[in-house]
């Protein structure tokens, strides 16, 4: 019975020591942090090509920093990777133009990015949709 109690006590001491070390590390990170509150961040610049891992530079008074960032490879370049939008469903296909459109309302601007409040996106109607429409027309005539 004694070895079991000794092991339990040892485990509790190790757990307490680990928690104390984590707390000390967290306090150290806070002390290294900046007192400056008004940071201005630039855009995320990818290391290669136009997406993937990269860096963003920020400045506040005399201080400057670089943060790691990531640009998704499916981002819409004209909106910027730091502008997040909530999009509605795609509208119907226009017979005149052959495109369908939808709008997006700004949800969040990251790192003080300058974003448009509302954006509009259009894309061509797919051949698959046209084929489905023709198939439906044919079935109704029988």
From Swiss-Prot:
The keyword Zinc-finger does not apply. SUPFAM superfamilies: Midkine. GO terms for biological process: cell differentiation; positive regulation of cell division. One of its GO terms (molecular function) is growth factor activity. InterPro entries: Midkine_heparin-bd_GF, PTN/MK_C_dom, PTN/MK_C_dom_sf, PTN/MK_diS_sf, PTN/MK_N_dom, PTN/MK_N_dom_sf, PTN_MK_heparin-bd_GF_CS. Has mitogenic activity, and neurite extension activity for PC12 cells. This is Midkine. It comes from Gallus gallus. The lineage of its organism: Eukaryota, Metazoa, Chordata, Craniata, Vertebrata. The gene is RIHB.
């Amino acid at each position: 019975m004694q070895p079991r109690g000794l092991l339990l006590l040892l485990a509790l001491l190790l757990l307490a020591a680990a928690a104390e070390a984590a707390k000390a590390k967290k306090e150290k990170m806070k002390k290294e942090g900046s007192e400056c509150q008004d940071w201005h961040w630039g855009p995320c610049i990818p290391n290669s090509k136009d997406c993937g891992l990269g860096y963003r530079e920020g400045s506040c008074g005399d201080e400057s920093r670089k943060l790691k960032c990531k640009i998704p490879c499916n981002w819409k370049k004209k909106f910027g990777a730091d502008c997040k939008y909530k999009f509605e469903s795609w509208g119907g296909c226009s017979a005149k133009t052959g495109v369908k459109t939808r709008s997006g309302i700004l949800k969040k601007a990251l790192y003080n990015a300058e974003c448009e409040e509302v954006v509009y996106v259009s894309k061509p109607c797919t051949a698959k949709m046209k084929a489905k429409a023709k198939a439906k027309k044919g079935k109704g005539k029988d």
